[in-house]
Amino acid sequence: MGVIARQSIKGAIANYIGVAIGFYVSFFILTRYLTQEEIGLTRVMVDAAVLFSSLASLGSNASIVRFFPWFRDGGRHHGIFGWSLLLPLAGFSLFALIFLIFKAPLLEAYSVNAPLLADYFHLVPMLTFFALYVTVFETNASVLMRITVPKLVREVGIRLFNLAAYLLYGYRLISLDLFVCLFCGSYALAMLLNLFYLLKINRFDFSIFRIDRRFLTRDRVREVLRYTLFMTAAVLAGNIPLFNSLFLGAKAGLALTGVYTIASYVANVVEVPYRSLGAISRPVIAAAVKEERWDEVSRLARQVSLHQLLVSLLIFTLIWINIDALFTVIPNGADYAAGGVVVFVLGLAKVVNSSLSIATDVLNYSRLYSRSLLFIALLTAAAIGFNQLLIPRMGIGGAAAATLCAYGLYFALLLAYLHLRLRVSIFSAAQLKVLTLIALMLLLGEAWSRWLTPLLGLHVLLDAALKTLLLAALALWGVYSWRISQSVNDLLKKFVRAQ
């Protein structure tokens, strides 16, 4: 647990540095120098690449986490890293073939409302390859408990590389064509940096491709292959929000997708802690599931879920009470203010996913992992159906609502299934305390905006800062005095003693 805590903290620091950079870039660079259509273009390209790379991985990223404890023997890993490199390559080759076959109908779907995307659609396979191996190398580092540097590359490095491309294009030093190439190249650079890091810590050499047959009995090979194939579908669960921008681009055009993009950047801040803690907690959950210690699995799952709920809801609340101030200060904010509803609804969806996704990990690492296909099929069908239904009626708000509805249906059924079959539950009384505290904060935030803001007459930024500080202090007091989390209380006590 000490390693988990240290790596979690370092990963969180990397995440929040990335969030700070991403916040500045998204709200003060993109909105100033790129049109809504150009913002939508970059978003659709990245979301398409991430979705396609998730499928092309053929479940290898999840399988290395699940089966790493089986292959680990002291400092040796008996070829599992070679498996994790070769399987995605096979998956990408299959994806490239399918892309060539269906390229024409895909282009036709975007030709009316998003003609700019058609000009750069040929770069999507290349971007998919880069995104695929950024994740592959990061997963390899994760199971070795060396996640900090890959997190820095993903959360900070890519954003800085993109910032350079935005500024070069914003000052018209490069053409749009070169800008898009540099934008894609940032993922290539991130992929190479992650590879060099693994080489530096002496985890990669040609011996990784020699799989020790003593560790691959016929039954185990069958289990690994079956699990990997099932996880090819299961990875869709984490990428449901990507459907939103893809559907919006085709049905509403890149300009509205650009507005949705800026709003979703705000909502994405909610799940930053999930990315860090999730990457470190999954190997621990996998080890407990492997030994079928279900009481321990429930304890770990409750702990992870509680802290994810607490942190994600606190971040969501502090964002929402300042949403009007945010759209007031960003360049061309009036053009993007319509995205406020997206921030609220998609933010709630991020809270649901962050706090409950540990249930997906438990199912995927258990002997019942094949059942995940049914749940993923349900989630995918729900996401597509809700997008088709709600986007024509509600626009960008419909895209956000589609994600929330799909997640709500998915997790309700999944949690019931885990409780019935494995007796695993992630709920605790402390979560009710969190919800009560957040409701109180939202009420006080609304009261402040209605009565104190006009009364005080402060500058919008000063008013937002004062409101945030006071409500954050109230939240800390509530967490401590209500004893929501013993771990958080211990951290607060240590912080007070250190002062």
Predicted regions and their residues:
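Membrane-interface junctions at transmembrane-helix termini in multi-pass inner-membrane proteins
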Residues: 5, 130-156, 347-378, 418-420
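Interhelical loop/hinge segments that connect adjacent transmembrane helices in multipass membrane
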Residues: 1-4, 116, 172, 176-182, ...
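Helix-loop junctions and terminal segments of transmembrane helices
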Residues: 27, 57-73, 143, 263-305, ...
